[in-house]
């Protein structure tokens, strides 16, 4: 496996069940949202992105694939999202932390909306010399440390492709 394979990673997350409520923060045009919505066929997925064009592209894909369990939210995660406290079973933050200025604010907001025992999957660039956003890459150990400040406990870690690390936390 070279680059990320969202469907394969989602299929391997044994804690997911079809009735869950999930949130894909930094959804872009749906690389994670679509396979997640299919997996959670009796649940719901919030797709959150700061870019209207990305959500518009995602809306078209959802319409084309006749996927109806996704709600699109235009929001800046660093300023908060309009999702109630303790309502989300599962959050995906894929390639988000390296992009944002205030990583702790993103983790605090994730912790706020997660239910007790909810899971947070963080996938981000490994620090490598030759590919990805190396100047902004975050160290896996720093993410684990920051998450612990918000009572997010590391449950699992794995490589997700050659260029990314994956961490699963529980609230």
Task: List the predicted regions and their residue ranges.
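Short alpha-helix
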Residues: 136-150
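Class I SAM-dependent methyltransferase SAM/SAH-binding core
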Residues: 23, 29-79
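A short acidic, Gly/Pro-enriched loop at the edge of an enzyme's catalytic core
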Residues: 78-90
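Conserved alpha-helix/loop element of class I SAM-dependent methyltransferases that forms part
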Residues: 2-20
């Amino acid at each position: 496996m070279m680059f990320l394979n969202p469907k394969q990673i989602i299929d391997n997350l044994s804690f997911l069940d079809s009735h869950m409520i999930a949130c894909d923060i930094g959804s872009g045009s749906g690389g994670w949202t679509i396979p997640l919505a299919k997996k959670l066929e009796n649940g719901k997925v919030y797709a959150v992105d700061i870019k209207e064009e990305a959500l518009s592209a995602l809306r078209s894909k959802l319409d084309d694939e006749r996927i109806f369990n996704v709600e699109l939210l235009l929001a800046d995660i660093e300023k908060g999202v309009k999702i109630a406290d303790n309502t989300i079973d599962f959050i995906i933050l894929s390639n988000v932390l390296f992009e944002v200025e205030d990583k702790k604010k993103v983790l605090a907001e994730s912790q706020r909306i997660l239910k007790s025992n909810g899971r947070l999957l963080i996938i981000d660039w490994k620090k490598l010399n030759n590919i990805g956003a190396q100047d902004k890459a975050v160290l896996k150990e720093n993410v684990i440390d920051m998450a612990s400040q918000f009572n997010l406990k590391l449950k699992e870690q794995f490589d997700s492709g050659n260029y990314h690390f994956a961490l699963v936390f529980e609230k």
